């Protein structure tokens, strides 16, 4: 494997989309150091980073010097520091949404562990709020589903039905399967989830792919609208 990468690569610095723990562990186990960080274009761009001798797999690292981070009541990551943009050029309305009370709202949900490492859980806009007040982060469920061979990709959303919000998994299958086979995957996944996270229904996505943005991210709003229009 080292030869494929030229034989001299021993350090990988990773940013952008979230790196799966499985991928990070793979490269660590073959002797390559993986340094994961987190930030936004609007933060020039770094907020947190792991170090070679101070890191945790699955985390985005610790807050870098000159930056302050805190979590809102929703656990959204808020940031301030000299590296933070003053705003969007000639777009005061977007700037007002981005920066409130001198804190930049990242739109990401995070948690700090006892050692100060930041773990990104998902996006605020994707969070599902159950009727009992419990927050469900679709990314936590999708990570488990997407490891199943039968599942090419999943998109978890919350559908309002009656007095509750139903956790629904839209599934792109890697091959044809019966509802019974799919339900086995759902049951297996649910065993790994907390009660409020459990998938309550699934829908097989019939098209070749989910609707995507220019950055290839699944457009959850469009997926939800499509499903709601058929129910």
Predicted regions and their residues:
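Conserved C-terminal "lid"/linker of ANL adenylate-forming enzymes
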Residues: 155-158, 188-231
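Ser/Thr-glycine-rich phosphate-binding loops at phosphate-binding pockets of nucleotides
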Residues: 39-43, 106, 131, 213-215
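AMP-binding/adenylate-forming catalytic core of the ANL superfamily
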Residues: 71, 81, 87, 109-195
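Gly/Ser/Thr-rich phosphate-binding loop
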Residues: 1-55
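Conserved ATP/PPi-binding loop(s) of AMP-dependent carboxylate-activating enzymes
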Residues: 32, 59, 63-65, 72-98, ...
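Structured core elements
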Residues: 13, 35-36, 48, 68-71, ...
């Amino acid at each position: 494997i080292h030869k494929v990468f030229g034989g001299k690569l021993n350090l990988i610095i990773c940013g952008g989309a979230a790196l799966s723990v499985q991928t990070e562990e793979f490269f660590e186990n073959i002797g390559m150091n993986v340094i994961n960080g987190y930030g936004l274009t609007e933060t020039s761009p770094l907020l947190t980073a792991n170090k070679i001798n101070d890191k945790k797999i699955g985390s985005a690292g610790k807050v870098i010097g000159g930056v302050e981070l805190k979590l809102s009541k929703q656990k959204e990551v808020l940031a301030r520091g000299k590296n933070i943009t003053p705003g969007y050029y000639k777009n005061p309305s977007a700037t007002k949404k981005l920066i409130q009370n001198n804190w930049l709202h990242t739109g990401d949900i995070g948690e700090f562990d006892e050692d100060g490492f930041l773990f990104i859980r998902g996006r605020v806009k994707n969070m599902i709020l159950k009727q009992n007040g419990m927050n469900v982060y679709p990314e936590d469920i999708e990570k488990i589903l997407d490891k199943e061979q039968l599942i090419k990709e999943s998109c978890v959303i919350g559908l309002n039905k009656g007095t509750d919000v139903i956790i629904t998994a839209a599934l792109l299958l890697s091959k044809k399967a019966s509802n019974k086979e799919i339900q086995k995957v759902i049951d297996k996944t649910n065993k790994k989830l907390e009660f409020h996270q459990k998938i309550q229904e699934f829908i097989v996505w019939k098209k070749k792919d989910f609707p995507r943005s220019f950055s290839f991210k699944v457009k959850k709003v469009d997926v939800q609208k499509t499903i709601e229009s058929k129910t």
